[in-house]
Regions:
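N-terminal secretory signal peptides that target proteins for export/translocation
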Residues: 1-14
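Periplasmic c-type cytochrome electron-transfer domains
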Residues: 32-476
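Hydrophobic alpha-helical segments, especially transmembrane helices
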Residues: 16-17, 467
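Residue-level detector of alpha-helical transmembrane segments in integral membrane proteins
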Residues: 2, 24, 161-162
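Secreted/extracellular small peptides and ectodomain modules produced from precursors
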Residues: 5, 20-23, 298, 305
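Bacterial N-terminal signal peptides
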Residues: 18-32
Length: 476
């Protein structure tokens, strides 16, 4: 089945449209061709989420489109990178996929967590496995370069898959939900749910004393290359604006494995990763068990002797000819255009979003800096609705687990662009770091700490104002 997808250039004039033709084979979509078309249609400036990286699309493929500003050669590399993103990794030797997975892992491919390039989902209850969620582990104190200290037997992430008959999985996690109600000022009742993590069938004994756990759903990949292109100076300017508004937003300071220096964090729920390359190679290593130049050793704590005894799938299981197109793919991902930006209700919701203080952290506009890896991403005006800073979100959202300078109550401001297409892309609208919020209203009501005043402003709004604010969020 062939499906054309249309992408929009920066100035809103669709003079060169890139159509990505996707071929579905065995239930998986692969990019098969790229075509150039001509059109004189226009899109209003208010709909341009990301300048020349904006695309006009409202389907399940909305998060997987190339930026229209790419060259023909870059589009070819994007196509190869998309195939790499879909690639299934297997334990060597096998004829069923690419060698290198494991010995322990949490999946077989990037799409296991980022289905259609979108967000993960939390399981409905303890009987359902964690398909696009994982559990972080650490013990009190700081590790190397100030990173969290891993559990000595299980590392910093529970690995739920091993090699049948050879390497046991580390254990399994179950999520239990408890529900409670919140009353809004006009009498409407909203049900919220709180997760509890249960770790079962631990293969290497009990967890270390003082163990800290945190459930994490995979974030969407919308515009990650543009966020990578935002300069440190722009992030520090965001922190200055935050202080001027009486907020305490601040950047995380983390270890840059690629450049071997301290750097500002920008990726991850606690902004604990400084750049997109490190984010990708870390995910390959920790989630799929795939080694690389930066992670040459298998992910096997010392007690896991069967894991350490497994032969590798190659010298580096993630070689540059495979990694480079995947990295280009991530850097060049486009951002869907806003929808209904001119609608009166949406515009009123935008005003309420600002007047209630939501934009104190969810800043609408950033500008990218010089970006050598993909020059087309340089000096773009973008509207991700994030400041890329850490904020104290209150005790109700605290996970009890610090990460570099991020405390237990601190979370990075999540980008909101593409939010309104989440249900279309992934079939759910689960939000926050562990997917506890099932829609935008629930997510807002979980906000505390620095966001408490904004939450209370929302709680006091009449229903029609709350609906307008949510309509604005759905337009992003």
């Amino acid at each position: 089945m062939l499906t054309p997808r249309l992408c929009l250039p920066a100035n809103g004039t669709m003079r060169r449209i890139v159509a990505v033709l996707w071929v579905t084979f065995a239930g998986t979509a692969f990019p098969a061709a790229l075509l150039a078309l001509d059109s004189s249609d226009r899109l209003p400036a208010s709909a341009l989420s990301a300048s020349g990286f904006t695309v006009l699309i409202e389907t399940e493929e909305s998060y997987r489109q190339p930026a229209p500003v790419l060259t023909a050669k870059q589009l070819e590399a994007f196509t190869e990178g998309s195939k790499g993103f879909l690639q299934r990794w297997v334990v060597a030797p096998s004829i069923l996929g690419l060698w290198g997975r494991g010995p322990t892992s949490n999946g077989e491919a990037c799409t296991d967590c980022h289905d259609n390039g979108g967000r993960g989902r939390a399981p409905s209850g303890p009987e359902e496995s964690l398909q696009s969620m994982l559990v972080r582990l650490s013990i009190p104190g700081s590790g190397l370069y100030g990173a969290p200290r891993p559990d000595p037997n299980y590392g910093d992430q529970l690995q739920e898959e091993g090699i049948l008959g050879r390497v046991p999985p580390e254990g399994h996690a179950a999520i239990h939900w408890s529900e409670f109600t919140v009353a809004l000022d006009d009498g409407e009742i909203v049900r919220l749910r709180r997760p509890r993590i249960e770790l079962r069938e631990l293969a290497f004994g009990p967890l270390a004393p003082g163990i800290m756990t945190s459930a994490r759903v995979a974030p969407p990949l919308v515009g990650v290359g543009l966020l990578d292109a935002v300069s440190d100076e722009a992030i520090l300017a965001s922190a200055a604006r935050s202080r001027a508004r009486g907020l305490r937003g601040r950047p995380n300071r983390v270890w840059d494995l690629i450049n071997e220096r301290e750097a500002i964090g920008r990726f991850g729920h606690k902004a604990n990763v400084p750049n997109l390359l490190q984010q990708i190679v870390t995910a390959y290593h920790e989630d799929l068990g795939v080694t690389s130049f930066w992670f040459p050793e298998e992910n096997c704590p010392h007690i896991q002797t069967a894991c350490a005894a497994e032969p590798p799938g190659g010298h580096f299981e993630l070689p540059s000819p495979f990694l480079d197109p995947v990295l280009l793919y991530a850097r060049a991902l486009a951002v869907p255009a806003r929808r209904n930006a001119g609608d009166t209700k949406v515009q009123r919701g935008a005003a309420l979003f600002s007047s209630s203080g939501c934009d104190g952290c969810h800043m609408s506009t950033l500008e990218t800096g010089d970006y050598t890896p993909l020059p087309a991403a340089s000096h773009q005006i973008i509207h991700p609705y994030t400041d890329l800073l850490l904020h104290d979100m209150g005790e109700d959202l605290a996970d009890g687990r610090p990460d570099y300078l991020a405390g237990p109550r601190d979370w990075r401001t999540a980008p909101l662009w593409g939010l309104g297409l989440s249900a279309t892309v992934n079939g759910n609208s689960m939000l926050l770091h562990d997917g506890r919020a099932r829609d935008a209203t629930e997510a807002i009501l979980w906000h505390g700490g620095e966001a408490q005043d904004a939450r209370e402003a929302f709680r006091r709004m009449p229903k029609e104002d709350r609906e307008a604010l949510v309509a604005f969020l759905q337009s992003l």
